Amino acid sequence: MSLRIMVVDDSQATRRVVSALVGSRWTVCGSAENGKTAVKKFMELRPDLVLLDLGMPDIDGIEVGRQIHAIDASTPLILFTLSDPWGLEAPARKAGFTHVISKSEPWKLLDSIKEIVEGLERGHDEASGDTSKHGRSRRDGSVN
């Protein structure tokens, strides 16, 4: 699956590094340096996934995620932060985030994106009635 990802971080260096990291496997369709720009670009680009930094100068990443989730609740959101991710799980999930990842563990970012891609592919297969991978057809409930 060709996943289109938008990267949002106030640090240009972080945007570049993360874009290079995820861009080696998927398409980085855009980036933003603050929350207001992120919401605007989200509406223009309609990426398949949004990767958001927590600490931005205008609007924090959780609020940006909440706004994006209100526009399109089907778009997966990943919070990528220097803060302790454990304390952010509950508010992030409530705002619509699927994953909270520490910037000190970038390999977890790739694993989370892979997990999201697999989930999107499963959803596409089920919606189209493709039962070759999962053994059940959504249309009639029968087993292959």
Regions from the language model: what does each represent?
Residues 9-10, 34:
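Acidic di-acidic motifs
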Residues 43-45, 67-74, 95:
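Conserved phosphotransfer cores of two-component systems
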Residues 53, 81:
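Active-site residues of response regulator receiver
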Residues 57, 85:
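The feature encodes the CheY-like receiver
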Residues 61, 93-98:
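As written
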